Every structure is written in C-alpha cells, then in structure tokens.
C-alpha cells in the first residue's frame, strides 16, 4: 500500500491528473511484485484525486479523479552471477502505464522502456523514455525522458550500540 499528497501553485490546463507535477491532491494505491529467477514483475493500481491548486480553482467541467494502473517487467542483465547484495545491478525494464478518468471516460496508455542501476541494494538510478501509445485526453507531456534517483534509508532510527 502507498499514499502521497501534493501541493501545486500552477494553473490547471490539462485533462490528465498528475499530482507529481501538475495538480494538488492525493493518491492511494497498492503495488504487487513477484520475483521469478532474474525477472521482476510488478503491477500497480491507484486512485488519484485532484483539488484546487492554491488560488487556481479546479475547473468544474473537468474530471477530478482518476484510476491509474501499470504493469512492469524488469530483467537482471548484470551481474551474470549474483552473489551479494553489495553488487551493482543493471536491469532492463519495460513498463505499461495508463490512466482513466471515470467521470468522462477519457484515458491514455503509455509504454516506457528504461535501464536501471542499483548500487549496494540501496541507491537506484533509472534512465528511460516514455511514449504515448493511445490517448483521448489533453496532456502537457505525453512523451519524454525520465531520469530518477532514489536512496533507501534502512532502519534509520535503529539504535546502533
């Protein structure tokens, strides 16, 4: 399970609901992942709700909620022989992503191939490109590059005596 809340001050000018960049609002969802040998499969479904962007009111004529879904597959390319969590991993990934606005039926469907590097099982760098396959909604960025860095803090409050 996951959830996030975001604030944004920009004007609202697209059908797509995206609290990680364009909308204020919240998102809650569930992620299921299965590791099969050197391949990881992951599915996500979430509910996303947009609200006013500070003084920029959400348009009454636009759908304010969305159902998001994704399916991804990642394959460990290197190292060939995995022996330790400290090894650097290189993964090839492909992700299918979509959003549907239940209030008006508009939707999009994208594909996003990427390369991922994982260092010491704690730091992650993803580089990829997202392509729009189908869409019936107005979107600001239907395609584009992705560069992401994540760093996990394992037990940051653990007493280390």
Ranges and model annotations:
Residues 1-66:
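Outer-membrane pore/translocation modules
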Residues 20-26, 61-69, 88, 107-111, ...:
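Residues that define the transmembrane beta-barrel architecture of outer-membrane proteins
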Residues 38, 78-90, 122, 155-161:
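Short loop/turn motifs that connect adjacent beta-strands in outer-membrane beta-barrel proteins
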Residues 10-14, 52-56, 82, 103-106, ...:
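Outer-membrane beta-barrel proteins
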Residues 71-73, 142-161:
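Outer-membrane beta-barrel "beta-signal"
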Residues 1-3, 43-45, 71, 92-96, ...:
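Membrane-embedded beta-strand positions of outer-membrane beta-barrel proteins
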Residues 42-48, 63-76, 87-99:
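Alpha-helical membrane segments in multi-pass integral membrane proteins
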